[in-house]
Amino acid sequence: MRYCPRCASPLVECGIAGRARLSCPDAACGYVFWDNPLPVLAGLVERDGLVVLARNHAWPEKMFGLVTGFMERGETPEEGVAREVQEELGLVTRSASLIGIYPFQRKNEIILAYHVVAEGEIALNEELAEFRLIPPEKLRPWDFGTGLAIRDWLARRSS
């Protein structure tokens, strides 16, 4: 963000509430860009005992991940993850339980990750290129973002 959304003045960096923040230099305006993290939903989707990993069209050929998306106004996180699973995979959510909350600082996001038990036939939407059904014991978590949720989910399953 380079300009004030209220008065169009160029934003400047200054110390506010103990941190460097972008703000409007016009004292009459007073706009501060707080740059708060955005909540993102992630679904570790299990269908018929297998985990669904999906590849976004924008991702490299061998890169697969969990279903993710943003909440809509007025929905609970559980409703939001069920909607994302329906929209992206065409599956109906039978249950959604919180795995955990994870930082994704590279994108200034907070991930709310859910274990979703779903049913139906997979029908990918236009965002996704392909999917894979993986037995849980073959999952290999990565060390950031939604990979941390996979790690925690696998640890709970084995205990």
Segments (PLM) and residue ranges:
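Acidic, metal-coordinating catalytic segment for phosphate/diphosphate chemistry
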Residues: 1-42
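Conserved Nudix-box catalytic region and its N-terminal flanking loop in Nudix hydrolases
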Residues: 46-87
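Conserved hydrophobic/aromatic beta-strand scaffold that supports enzyme active sites
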Residues: 3, 23, 44, 53, ...
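Short, charged, solvent-exposed linker or helix-capping segments at domain edges/interfaces
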Residues: 123-128, 142-145
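Active-site-adjacent beta-strand/loop module that shapes the phosphate/pyrophosphate-binding cleft
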Residues: 102-123, 132, 136, 153-154
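A short coil-to-beta-strand element that immediately follows conserved catalytic motifs
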Residues: 14-15, 92-100
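Long C-terminal interaction/binding lobes of large macromolecular proteins
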Residues: 137-143, 147-149, 153-159
